[in-house]
From Swiss-Prot:
Protein name: 3-ketoacyl-CoA thiolase
Superkingdom to which the source organism belongs: Bacteria
Species annotation: Salmonella paratyphi A (strain AKU_12601)
Record gene name: fadI
Compartments reported by the entry: Cytoplasm
GO CC annotation terms, alphabetical: cytosol
Amino acid sequence: MRQALPLVTRQGDRIAIVSGLRTPFARQATAFHGIPAVDLGKMVVGELLARSEIPADAIEQLVFGQVVQMPKAPNIAREIVLGTGMNVHTDAYSVSRACATSFQAVANVAESLMAGTIRAGIAGGADSSSVLPIGVSKALARVLVDVNKARTTRQRLTLFSRLRLRDLLPVPPAVAEYSTGLRMGDTAEQMAKTYGITREQQDALAHRSHQRAAQAWAEGKLAEEVMTTYVPPYKNPFAEDNNIRGASTLADYAKLRPAFDRKHGSVTAANSTPLTDGAAAVILMTESRAKELGLHPLGYLRSYAFTAIDVWQDMLLGPAWSTPLALERAGLTMADLTLFDMHEAFAAQTLANLQLLGSERFAREVLGRAQATGEVDDAKFNVLGGSIAYGHPFAATGARMITQTLHELRRRGGGFGLVTACAAGGLGAAMVLEAE
């Protein structure tokens, strides 16, 4: 094992995560229908600051992400600063790493803290699958550019006459990988077939996710980290995730047909994460700054790792690659962890990564490591459920996982937790967290 890389400032301060918050997550076109991601981001950051009682000028940087970006607000981070009453001089910029976007935002703020350029910052992400940038066809887009340069009405009419009726149809955002044309569900089907993951195993994991999430809400474990929201016409509160199946039964999952490979597939809408709207954010600062402000951190960022693999086959294996690297940098092994939380993009993807984490052959032949990362103890794995139940607003999921894991570590008396996610483009992310 290589030497651990301590995540500390020049003065030896640890990177503290002092608080975290998210909106409830809503299925597409339900509670947050018509609410853009930038407004969801403003909601969560404004409430996070209000609850923390941190002086507004204490936050020196905001790094925020959005995967499905809107042309009207390309820098969501800056819009959040301007729309929440934060100091107008607060540095703010946006990031995107697909489903690992808020992992990246957290890492960026942590790096600023370690560099000594700031002492406190906010990281997070928001996405809306209900407010989408509906585009136009390539043919219409080209004509519109040319029309803008045309000098006469006749020239403009000539340009428009080249269009066919189909060229006028709206174009929704792409759901496939740009480089391969494969949808995420197609990749999940690849992984199910490659690693021999059955439909029954996938449905069982989805059922488990919903059961755990429903239990977490019933026991009040999420109340502190999920805000109550009000949206126009501001009559009814929305306070709990609305995708969770409170009365989940395995028999219900078996009724659904495959969603991607309709003849021979096993990936369904029920064992996949749904399109979701929501936002989440965390406040990070140096350990000494937290003490100055009289704050008691939720926990600390011990290490992080980002990885990338090929996109043509089984590209959602990011956790199997990034987890051993994050553990190594933290100076820990799988056995040292109290909790292990993995983003459930699909049940097939989750089960494939779990399988490879325990595989000696994968470790030796693919990762070039002497031994497997380690089997994940079911008693430590996604103990409060995962994205299949909660939903997945792309840029917000990482911040949800970090906040949720730190709260659960504290309930258990402290320890180490690892959070990890796959992402489009063959990317992977993992972070080791510590709570006392």
